Amino acid sequence: MINAYETEDGVVFDMSNLECEALRSYADGLLSDPEHPFVELLRGQGLVVGDAPVPHLGALLQAFSQATKVLAAWVVAPAGWRRVTFFVGPHSAVVSRCDDGGLYADEHDMVSVWAIDSAQLRDTFFGLSAIGEPTGEGVLPTAVPEVLFSALEQGDGAKILVEVPKVAREIAEVIDTEIDEATGTFWADVADEAWVGLTVRVDDVVTYPDLLGDSWRVIATSQDVCEVLSVVEFAKLYPDDVPLLADKDGEFWAAAAPSSPEVLWEDVEDVLAE
């Protein structure tokens, strides 16, 4: 069941991973069976009339087909699943998802990575927020505050490091209060471990960006991040000089360099299990 929860800033959507995948398929025009259970679900909520989505849902789905990976990771919580992580940079937001094995991949997991231009993300958020239900209420939340978009546009690394977990915590508080303990715990974990979600740029599962040369500039270290987020448990996992990097075009990436990717995933999972 897709649930929508009102907040002061808008609506937070909650759906299962299956429903999230079905919505992506439907948005991409791959789900054409009018008798499909997910179409029935949408029909039952008044979002499909006959065999066609109502106009505002059509616009929503069209936007989702372009930006759903980012939007779903941020505002559509696959409750209880550690499958999606995201990070943001001066010019883009990126979502990575392990197709098997949970949020943190090992060498056997397939990792999918999507990126969206932050200006497009901003326009999509505000555009979708303006698309009204018949009652005139917005369809998607406006819970991502202006200050975060400002940080993105200005390439302000310090603001990004503060605002990403702040937004996640705000969402976690809403879900923890309004939804259920399991989902609230999921988002609280996302908030507290948000800097781990600032993951490496993925070419394949075990390939990291080349840290040599002038194409990268350090904007923070792991110690800086731990201090900002007060996640002291993670400080012991990495040396203080592990860099967070921005490339010559201002693209923001984080880099973690343990002895091996396998050690990283094992360490993180151990901390999360405590």
Model-predicted regions and their roles:
Residues M1-E274:
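Short, surface-exposed polybasic-aromatic patches that bind anionic ligands, especially phosphate groups
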